[in-house]
């Protein structure tokens, strides 16, 4: 190894994002990455974007104060039973404040109701499952009740799509 008197050039190479990406896709990914200025803005504590008092999940509050790099390293864990119970109690407390107590207790026993936090937009299109629809079902034999027989076909025909001769939907 002989010392070389000529000055050496240092070559800096930018590692490719992913070897299987074409250069155009790599450029699009690079453009979408946040700049340091936007990272500072999003991690700013004085930012009024999120009201932490309105967030019921204490784990979410702690992740908001983390930097994006710390949030990326953190793996998602399922909530413990205690955390889940506090979230449910918080949700039910909000429901009781907005609705009358009778409606909230009836909706919790219904198996067809939507999960908490999701508005039930399809209730108008579904057949009525309370009172009137269940009275005729009581007179039917128990085998039909166990199979979950729907009300008469007259009620459902308005909600069914027309089918062609092969059974495919025309719409």
Curated annotation (Swiss-Prot):
Quaternary state and interactors: Interacts with PPP1R15A.
Region Essential for activity, annotated ranges: 9-12, 42-54
Family membership noted in the UniProt record: Belongs to the protein phosphatase inhibitor 1 family.
Organism, scientific name: Rattus norvegicus
Positions of modified residues (Phosphothreonine): 35
Keyword terms, alphabetized: Acetylation, Carbohydrate metabolism, Glycogen metabolism, Phosphoprotein, Protein phosphatase inhibitor
GO cellular component: cytoplasm; extracellular space
Biased composition (Polar residues): 122-133
Gene Ontology biological process terms in this record: glycogen metabolic process; intracellular signal transduction
Region Disordered: start-end pairs: 17-171
Name recorded for this polypeptide: Protein phosphatase 1 regulatory subunit 1A
Biased amino acid composition, Basic and acidic residues: 19-29, 137-148
Region annotated Interaction with PPP1R15A, chain positions: 143-171
PTM comment: Phosphorylation of Thr-35 is required for activity.
Organism ancestry: Eukaryota, Metazoa, Chordata, Craniata, Vertebrata
Phosphoserine modifications at: 43, 46-47, 67
Any coiled-coil regions, as ranges: none
Residues bearing PTM N-acetylmethionine: 1
Pfam families to which the protein is assigned, alphabetical: DARPP-32
Record-linked InterPro entries: PPP1R1A/B/C (IPR008466)
Molecular-function annotations in GO: protein phosphatase inhibitor activity
Role played: Inhibitor of protein-phosphatase 1. This protein may be important in hormonal control of glycogen metabolism. Does not inhibit type-2 phosphatases.
Matching PANTHER family: PROTEIN PHOSPHATASE 1 REGULATORY SUBUNIT 1A (PTHR15417:SF4), PROTEIN PHOSPHATASE INHIBITOR AND DOPAMINE- AND CAMP-REGULATED NEURONAL PHOSPHOPROTEIN (PTHR15417)
